[in-house]
Amino acid sequence: MCEACKKTFYITTPIYYPSAKLHIGHTYCTVATDAMARYKRLQGYDVMFLTGTDEHGQKIEDKAKAAGVTPQQFVDNIVAGPKGILDLWKLMNISNDRFIRTTDDYHVESIQKIFRKMYENGDIYKGEYKGKYCTPCESFWTESQLKDGKCPDCGGEVHDASEEAYFFRLSKYAGRVRELLTTTDFLQPKSRVNEMVNNFIDPGLEDLCVSRTSFTWGVPVDFDPGHVVYVWVDALFNYTTALGFMNEKYHDYDKYWPADVHFVGKEIVRFHSIIWPAMLMSMGMPLPKHVYGHGWLVMDGGTMSKSKGNVVDPYVLAEKFGVDALRFFLLRTFPFGSDGNFSNELLIQTINMDLANDLGNLVSRTTAMVEKYFGGTLPTERLDTDADDDLKQMVSTPVSYTHLTLPTKA
């Protein structure tokens, strides 16, 4: 099929926050996205697979200060330094087509234009923010949304925040977002829909604080330099700026947007299924076709997170068990929409049972038969049968993959 004739398929991971090295949970999401991208290429699609890093925010600024370096130096080391994120994805054979960093000049330029446009159309206005803020999650919360006085997402401490800020009229789009979630398959799996509607939309969406003045590491609001753009506004639009929206770096926006699916962890479904479509509605832009909120990898029933320090290093696992074995384990073991209990014991058990025993025995028996019947050498000339022709046809065409769909694959 000619390149211009191919259907397009645009798939993304979330862009990861480089406050520390990534853990096996991030690898899980990226490997799953990679598997889907490879699968769609087998079907003959023109695939755009995007991943990257979300590099602004108060947490990065605080981490850099504690390390005695600039924020840019801090994220450069995590992203592009030895055994950084770029090295990890290379090690794990991730086939992404692009990698975006929110500190890239073209992205910063685009975000300033986007923020200004929403301001000029009346959906961003100036006010004063008073409420709770979770620095690890870079999230604003009302008192009623807290869980036992702590962040409902990560369980961490929140602090009072009071500062001049710009706000996005999120409340204006509550009805349209609710309709999107409840009448379409935009958000998957369906279990996530009730959570978003019951916990966030129906209690009443408040306008979203979209700028900060209490720190400086972010995209400056070009018409009010004392403000930097809220990190989630900066981050979410990466899916469009990486295609050239409002910049001249790339020219693929009309070709690939809207995205076919965003794969994201369930802890950021709220941003992708409520805030993201609302801002796109404000901009008059098409919405992504699907957001898929996958589950967490947990250890002994507890969530794995950088802030808790209870993470598993994918480099260690890949070096010990091999990249292909680790990829197989992540894709084989955990239902994608549900949480999964990770343990070294389960990893070893899966490798032994599925690879060493089943696949290993097949290879062992095949090589033994080659040795016994052909003297250890396969004949260079052989007679093909009808069964051989059928097998060749099956493995050389993507048609056999077309019965699989996103829900069955995930």
Spans of features found by a protein language model:
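Acidic, turn-prone loop/beta-hairpin segments
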Residues: 54, 374-400
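Short, glycine/acidic-enriched loop or turn micro-motifs at the edges of active sites
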Residues: 57, 237, 408
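Short linear capping/connector segments at secondary-structure termini
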Residues: 95-101, 343-346, 378-384
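A glycine-rich phosphate-binding loop feature that marks nucleotide/adenosyl-phosphate handling sites
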Residues: 132-136, 295-297, 346, 382-386
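N-terminal, positively charged nucleic-acid-binding surface of large information/translation enzymes
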Residues: 2-186
